[in-house]
């Protein structure tokens, strides 16, 4: 192969030499040489008997056709060429576009808006922005960027660049890269970015209301707290982002990234990762990576990288490795994945509930705590995230990771998950209940109730209520994000990662590896990861993990194993009843 390439290159250069030497000659007409310069050439006598005196290719074509004009005609052609050349010269370099070092550039089919530096677009530093049906508006702690219908917008701590319909935009606190078919938007540093196909930010089909500060926000057509059937409302202590029906919105205490149509977004006290239907996402303590349906969006506290169509992206607190479609990393076909630090990892086909050190997260197919079929309400002590029907939402006291429909987290095909630190792990096919160091979490297929240390989350088919450590629903001590039916929302204390339909992303607190097509991602450091077929919520600073396709249990601090999901569920019924009773009051 190398020999073939070498011969091909040699022949190519020989051809160029012959062509340049014998095929063309420079324009030798002194009257035109100053206008055309060296970039205009004329054929040699081989094709032009007159050997070119101020003639252009168009003129030579006429000669090839047998036209032989007299000297007078040739002179008139030369004079015409002079006039044309002057016009051409006058038109050169007409348009130039520049932007400032700290400025934003946006483009896109039907409009894009982005900002950079420390500026806000379509909203204010600490202000809220809402928009209309198919509009996009977002804001961030200090910077906000919204974009249009199928466009993408991003901003960055220092610089921002957005692009159009099928373009990708990324930014990062320091560096950011994103891509994707129907692109995603990312931001980094202390900026917020939202996007979506028909996205909505801080708005909904029938509109929503958001506020900031330490206030509460409710909305929704039939919805519950922080969102409505097809609407979304969110607010945050400093940042707020909500989006509409099929949109994506994200914000973060410091960094937030959301992606597109059926993508998923997550948040975390410090790091959060959620993914979508068949996607995998993992996050890392300091870094963040997300991707979209077939697109990718990412941002990072420091650096961010996202990738495209069915690509994989990974990052890590220090190191991260993720792989692709049917690959596995940090786990094997029948292998298991553990979590790092003091965190636990759970998974399960339809299971899912975990909470974090001080935060609570629950979810369910048609439920509502931190997510629901069409409703969403979630909160967190510092960050809040809710999502819609097929979406995934997660938050965590410090770190949280959830994933989507058929995904697995930190575990393998037939494997189970263990817990760490001081946490217990229980699982079950259709019911999971786990709690963390000091938190309790319960969930079920169609009903979920979980609470955190100082948090409480309850849900119902069409109603939800969640609050945070000191916050009310749909808002967070610092940040709040809600989204709509098929939307994704994420925020993160410092870093956020979301990804899309069939994508994979992984990270690690120190080192993280995620894999495969229907595999899931694990996290490390002090992060938690949970997954489940159609709903997943997990967290864990010192958190609990539940897993198992058909139930698996891992040992807690005392090495106790829980294998029977039914018995475990029975043990939690009384707690669930008490929590529901308290919420009803």
From Swiss-Prot:
Residues 96-113, 194-209, 218-233, 274-297, 322-337, 362-393, 402-417, 442-465, 530-553, 560-569 have a biased composition (Basic and acidic residues). Residues 59-85, 117-129, 469-481 have a biased composition (Acidic residues). It is found in: Parasitophorous vacuole. Residues 51-585 are annotated as: Disordered. Its main location: other. Keywords: Malaria, Repeat, Signal. Sequence repeats lie at residues 102-109, 110-117, 118-125, 126-133, 134-141, 142-149, 150-157, 158-165, 166-173, 174-181, 182-189, 190-197, 198-205, 206-213, 214-221, 222-229, 230-237, 238-245, 246-253, 254-261, 262-269, 270-277, 278-285, 286-293, 294-301, 302-309, 310-317, 318-325, 326-333, 334-341, 342-349, 350-357, 358-365, 366-373, 374-381, 382-389, 390-397, 398-405, 406-413, 414-421, 422-429, 430-437, 438-445, 446-453, 454-461, 462-469, 470-477, 478-485, 486-493, 494-501, 502-509, 510-517, 518-525, 526-533, 534-541, 542-549. Residues 102-549 are annotated as: 56 X 8 AA tandem repeats of E-D-[EK]-V-S-N-G-[RG]. Pfam families: S-antigen. This is S-antigen protein.
């Amino acid at each position: 192969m190398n020999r073939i390439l070498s011969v091909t290159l040699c022949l190519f250069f020989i051809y160029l030499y012959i062509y340049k030497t014998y095929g063309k000659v420079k324009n030798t007409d002194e009257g035109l040489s100053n206008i055309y310069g060296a970039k205009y050439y004329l054929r040699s006598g081989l094709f032009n008997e007159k050997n070119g005196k101020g003639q252009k290719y168009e003129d030579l074509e006429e000669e090839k056709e047998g036209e032989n004009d007299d000297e007078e005609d040739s002179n008139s052609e030369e004079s015409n060429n002079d006039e044309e050349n002057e016009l051409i010269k006058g038109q050169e370099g007409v348009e130039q576009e520049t932007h400032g070092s700290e400025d934003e550039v946006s483009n896109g089919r039907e409009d894009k808006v982005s900002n950079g530096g420390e500026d806000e677009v379509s909203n204010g530093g600490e202000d809220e922005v809402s928009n209309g049906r198919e509009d996009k508006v977002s804001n961030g702690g200090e910077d906000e960027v919204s974009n249009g219908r199928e466009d993408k917008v991003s901003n960055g701590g220092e610089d921002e660049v957005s692009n159009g319909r099928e373009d990708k935009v990324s930014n990062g606190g320091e560096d950011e890269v994103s891509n994707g078919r129907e692109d995603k938007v990312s931001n980094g540093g202390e900026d917020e970015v939202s996007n979506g196909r028909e996205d909505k930010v801080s708005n909904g089909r029938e509109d929503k209301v958001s506020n900031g500060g330490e206030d509460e926000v409710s909305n929704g057509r039939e919805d519950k707290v922080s969102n409505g059937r097809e609407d979304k409302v969110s607010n945050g202590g400093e940042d707020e982002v909500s989006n509409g029906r099929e949109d994506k919105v994200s914000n973060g205490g410091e960094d937030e990234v959301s992606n597109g149509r059926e993508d998923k977004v997550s948040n975390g006290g410090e790091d959060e990762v959620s993914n979508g239907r068949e996607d995998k996402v993992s996050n890392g303590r300091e870094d963040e990576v997300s991707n979209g349906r077939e697109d990718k969006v990412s941002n990072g506290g420091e650096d961010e990288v996202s990738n495209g169509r069915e690509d994989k992206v990974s990052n890590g607190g220090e190191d991260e490795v993720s792989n692709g479609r049917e690959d596995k990393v940090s786990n094997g076909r029948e292998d298991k994945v553990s979590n790092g630090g003091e965190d636990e990892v759970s998974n399960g086909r339809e299971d899912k509930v975990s909470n974090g050190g001080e935060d609570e997260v629950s979810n369910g197919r048609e439920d509502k705590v931190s997510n629901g079929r069409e409703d969403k309400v979630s909160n967190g002590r510092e960050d809040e995230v809710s999502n819609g029907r097929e979406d995934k939402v997660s938050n965590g006291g410090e770190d949280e990771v959830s994933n989507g429909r058929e995904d697995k987290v930190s575990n393998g095909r037939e494997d189970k998950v263990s817990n760490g630190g001081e946490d217990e792990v229980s699982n079950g096919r259709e019911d999971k209940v786990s709690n963390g160091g000091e938190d309790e979490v319960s969930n079920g297929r169609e009903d979920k109730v979980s609470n955190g240390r100082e948090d409480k989350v309850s849900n119902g088919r069409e109603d939800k209520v969640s609050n945070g450590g000191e916050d009310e629903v749909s808002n967070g001590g610092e940040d709040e994000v809600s989204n709509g039916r098929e939307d994704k929302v994420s925020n993160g204390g410092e870093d956020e990662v979301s990804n899309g339909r069939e994508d994979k992303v992984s990270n690690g607190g120190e080192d993280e590896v995620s894999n495969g097509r229907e595999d899931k991602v694990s996290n490390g450091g002090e992060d938690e990861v949970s997954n489940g077929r159609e709903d997943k919520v997990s967290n864990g600073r010192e958190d609990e993990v539940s897993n198992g396709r058909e139930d698996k249990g891992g040992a807690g601090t005392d090495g106790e194993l829980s294998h029977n999901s039914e018995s475990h569920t029975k043990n939690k019924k009384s707690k669930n009843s008490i929590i529901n009773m308290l919420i009803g009051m």
